[in-house]
Amino acid sequence: MALSAALRLQSLRSLAPHCKLFASALQSHTQQPCRSHRLAPTDDELYQRTTVTRLERDSAEFMFIETYSSQGFIINGDKVVGPCAVIPKAILQWNVGSYKDINLESLSLFHMLSPRIEILVVGTGDRVERLDPNILKFMRQKGVAVEVQDTANACATFNFLVSERRITAAALIPPQLVPKDPL
């Protein structure tokens, strides 16, 4: 097959000076194909889908944060120790120590979920702490609104948004100073 293609190409070359139609055909067959597609993955393609181990017993219709303490949270009757990510129908451990550890990587889960999260409520502990403006801008570009509050208000805001049936997630760091620790 390669030999017949080479013979056809040779015959086209011999006819090319006599016919303009064959000259354009010869050029299109002898030029290297132009590659216009990307060969390197984009940032979103680097993150592959993964499986998640869910911490709650039964998937409730809505996630509801019942209480919080310096140790963690009680969400739908399940005790969660340490920082956590609350997404529709799942509770995940969130690997941050303080608000200073919140970066694009630690929030990457929230913009990759399907269906897309409308609002992410971030609880930064005892006080409202400012996050890097580039992080907030990036999340806005991904279509996720971010509300940063102290953890007590973040829990209340999350519960309110969920009660309105909004597609909401929460990223919560337990506060260190709680007057009465219910856990």
UniProtKB/Swiss-Prot annotation:
A GO cellular component annotation here is: nucleus
Q: Which organism is it from?
A: Xenopus tropicalis
Location of the protein in the cell:
Nucleus; Mitochondrion inner membrane
Task: Name the GO terms of the biological process aspect.
Answer: mitochondrial respiratory chain complex I assembly
Q: Output this protein's name.
A: NADH dehydrogenase [ubiquinone] 1 alpha subcomplex assembly factor 3
Instruction: Report the domain of life of the source organism.
Output: Eukaryota
Q: Which UniProt keywords apply?
A: Membrane, Mitochondrion, Mitochondrion inner membrane, Nucleus
Give the record's family classification. Answer: Belongs to the NDUFAF3 family.
